[in-house]
Amino acid sequence: MAHIPDGVISWPVLAGGIVTTLAGCAFGLKKLDPVAIPRTAVLSATFFVAALVHFPVGPTSVHLMLNGLIGIVLGWVAVPAILVGLLLQALLFGFGGIIVLGVNTFNLAVPALLCHGLFQLSRRSQHPKIIIATAGACGFLGVGLTAVLVATSLAFSGKEFASAAQLVVFAHLPIMLIETVFTAAAIALLLRVKPEALETDQGQELHLDHVQEDAQGKAYV
């Protein structure tokens, strides 16, 4: 969906996308810890592969995005990670465009950053069910917000794209549901086997080893 081809978006929208993406990448690279480079590479590669299976919808396409999951794990580093994935898709497979790369990155990265913030808020509860449910919501919102941003990009680029903009949003409803389940499951697994991959903003790790069961069988931390 975020793979809008060249020649579709108007120049003012292109310029805005380029400026904001460059700023986001610069900040993301500044935040990148060398220790996290392998993790970043794996998620960027996962994003690259997931989006290769796609179906055309008007001037864009329908496919998995995983930007909610990427945002949860990487935070600001998600911006350069998504940019690299999109660039390789455009160069190797002609999926999307080069000139429009800034807009495509913006449409995916902004929801990813919002999902990261939402997930960090949920972690203050220290309750696994709330955290996992929030992760699922982030999977849904990551796709939904990207659909809205893509539709907005098309709408600001000409009235002829108005109908396509509406179609983009509705066509991704199944993807939203799929990514809800996938993201929740992925975060639940990470919390159990590798919680250090999900550090809080204060650098503290959430461990669920001390989850206990109360008399009613309900889990609490």
Where are these regions (language model features)?
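Short helix-perturbing small/polar motifs within transmembrane alpha-helices
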Residues: 105-150
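Alpha-helix C-terminal capping segments
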Residues: 70-77
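Cytoplasmic-side transmembrane-helix entry/capping segments in multi-pass membrane proteins
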Residues: 35-44, 65-69, 102-109, 130-137
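C-terminal transmembrane helix-loop-helix hairpin of multi-pass membrane proteins
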Residues: 134-143, 157, 161-221
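Small-polar-interrupted transmembrane alpha-helices in polytopic inner-membrane proteins
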Residues: 44-48, 78-91
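Hydrophobic transmembrane alpha-helices
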Residues: 1-69
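Hydrophobic cores of alpha-helical transmembrane segments in multi-pass inner/ER membrane proteins
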Residues: 15-21, 109-118, 177-189
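Interfacial aromatic-anchored transmembrane helix boundaries in multi-pass membrane proteins
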Residues: 52-61, 84-115
